[in-house]
């Protein structure tokens, strides 16, 4: 059921020169407030991250054109203080979704479609690409910082066309 929906790439070589700086940007920009797990990050690496995302997506998906190039990078960071999570999707803001795992702490992510559910355990420096409408639930860390980034593409084509499902 999840075939052709979830794609995993190791981007270790692509981000090795700036990964630690990117983690520092995330930690420094985290808002100390309730629900501080998700926040928008202003990063000098945004163009590079989106280039990696788009290049990988073009390798495995059907041709697509980007409708909105007003790109954003969101950070999901959990630890002993902030570890809220829940099922969600990105269908209101995107067509293609990507998660980049910077510091995973051995935690994974669950995906759900209809009555089917799978659990996936990515590695540090992995990037997942999947349809924005696919429900998912990240596994939070309740100790050390778990840091991942969310990137989205809003396309002119439908998910069905792009993911060939």
What are these regions, as identified by a protein language model?
Residues 1, 164-165:
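C-terminal end-of-chain micro-motif
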Residues 1-68, 84:
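Non-heme Fe(II)/2-oxoglutarate
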Residues 68-140, 144-149, 154-163:
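Catalytic core of non-heme Fe(II) oxygenases with the double-stranded beta-helix
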